[in-house]
Regions:
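Short hydrophobic beta-strand element within catalytic cores of glycosyltransferases
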Residues: 319-323
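Aromatic "clamp/platform" in nucleotide-sugar-dependent glycosyltransferases that forms part
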Residues: 302
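Donor nucleotide-sugar binding/catalytic pocket of nucleotide-sugar-dependent glycosyltransferases
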Residues: 56-59, 127, 156-211, 217
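A conserved mid-protein helix/loop that constitutes part of the nucleotide-sugar donor-binding site
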Residues: 20, 220-243, 258-264
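A short, well-ordered alpha-helix in the C-terminal region of glycosyltransferases
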Residues: 272-275, 358, 365-380, 389-392, ...
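Short alpha-helical donor nucleotide-sugar binding micro-motif in glycosyltransferases
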Residues: 171, 281-282, 289-294
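Nucleotide-activated donor-binding/catalytic signature segment of Leloir-type glycosyltransferases, i.e.
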Residues: 262-282
Length: 401
């Protein structure tokens, strides 16, 4: 059992996104290690100390006003600077009064734009899993008209990794950096890293029962699940359907976001109302029903940092069609996914149509790929296996000093 100082500026099992991810890490690590958590208490939310009574929690209240404008706050995290100062001061004072930790682990923020408050102390430091900073492919750079203006600030990430001394020092001083996919190492190529390993930012508790779709009749059901933003490729998926008009395929789109209205307009303009159904946001239980009813999971996101939704789909024994860029390409194998290159919207739509046609026409191939998907996710994405790996990393880091 290691004495772990866990740094997570947001940690809430009743929230979504990174707050939920951090909570999963904290709860599970506390089952194996002696964890002290440094975090923020978001105004109006239940404190982490109440949600995680089995561990020591050091919690500061998020400054007023900084939590407003949810999407902007999610991207820029204006509260991170005061959290950084609080956490760094606490670490300095804790070490001065004789507290001892075997290592520090900072699993969030996932984005590679935030320096760690633990960098530079005489403690082994594990950062990650981190990811993001993927630019859009050149052929798509002028195609996004529905996203808010502030999402373009992501373009600054790579410049900061080149020029920001505090950010560079965090990764340079880390004893190990976990990246959510292989591309992260390429993005960090300009920073000398001591150790780099690939690990997804979250995992699955357990898998549902394997699903046998071999005897199904009726149209082949395609499924997309995710936030509706341009980079998810939903427009391109819709544009692919007229190219397979001779095949009995239908598409269910589960998710909400600024792309919903443009996608609904596109469906109407192409006369696809009978083949495409947009369901908006759905509860986790209902999303599970969509996975079970689907025959093929189609996720053509071309700037997807992680592969969590692909893990979910594989857990439901689904063959996948993904873009071979970022997280989904890394999370899947060639045995369970058709991986597409990406250059322009037109080429992506035609490649999607070709992949859909191949799978729609061959139930045996779908069945084999679905079985391979279930086997693959069982070997790579369960929390139990992930935490076993983390235990090994912790032991290695703690033994270095």
């Amino acid at each position: 059992m290691a004495r772990v100082l866990l740094i997570a500026p947001t940690c809430n099992g009743e929230d979504v996104g990174e707050a939920w991810v951090a909570f999963q890490w904290a709860r599970r690590l506390a089952e194996r290690h002696d964890v002290t958590l440094l975090t923020y208490h978001k105004r109006g939310a239940r404190p982490a100390a109440e949600q995680l009574p089995a561990m020591r929690v050091i919690e500061w209240c998020e400054p007023p006003l900084l939590g407003r404008a949810e999407r902007l706050n999610s991207l820029m995290k204006p509260a991170y600077l005061p959290f950084y100062l609080h956490a760094r001061r606490w670490i300095r004072q804790a070490l001065a009064r004789g507290e001892r930790f075997d290592l520090v682990h900072q699993p969030v923020p996932v984005a590679m734009r935030y320096p760690s408050p633990a960098a530079g102390f005489a403690l082994p430091l594990l950062i990650g899993p981190v990811g993001g900073s993927l630019p859009s492919p050149e052929g798509f750079t002028t195609d996004d008209t529905s996203s808010p203006w502030f999402t373009r600030l992501r373009a600054l990430d790579r410049h900061r990794l080149t020029w920001d001394p505090w950010l560079r020092a965090s990764f340079r001083n880390a004893d190990c950096v976990l990246g959510i996919a292989d591309y992260v190492k390429e993005i960090l190529a300009g920073v000398p890293l001591k150790d780099f390993q690939v690990m997804s930012e979250t995992g699955l508790d357990a898998l549902p029962e394997r699903i046998d779709r071999s005897g199904r009749q009726g149209p082949v059901r395609l499924l997309f699940v995710g936030r509706l933003v341009r980079t998810k490729g939903v427009r391109d998926l819709i544009r692919a359907l007229p190219l397979v008009s001779d095949l009995p395929v239908e598409l269910d789109i589960v998710g909400e976001g600024p792309e919903r209205a443009p996608c609904e307009a596109l469906v109407a303009s192409l006369g696809l109302e009978a083949r495409v159904r947009m369901h908006g946001w759905q509860s986790k239980e209902k999303v599970g029903a969509f996975y079970r009813a689907a025959d093929i999971f189609t996720f053509p996101s071309y700037r997807e940092p992680g592969g969590n939704v692909a893990l979910e789909a594989m857990g439901y024994s689904l063959p996948l069609i993904v873009v071979d860029r970022g997280g989904p390409g890394s999370a899947t194998s060639d045995l369970c996914a058709m991986k597409l290159s990406v250059s322009t919207p037109e080429k992506l739509a035609s490649d999607l149509a070709a992949a859909i046609a191949t799978l729609a026409a061959d139930a045996g191939l779908r069945d084999r790929m679905g079985r391979a998907a279930y086997d693959h996710v069982g070997k790579t994405a369960l929390w139990s296996a992930k935490l076993d790996r983390v235990d090994t990393i912790y032991a290695d880091l703690a033994g270095q000093r």
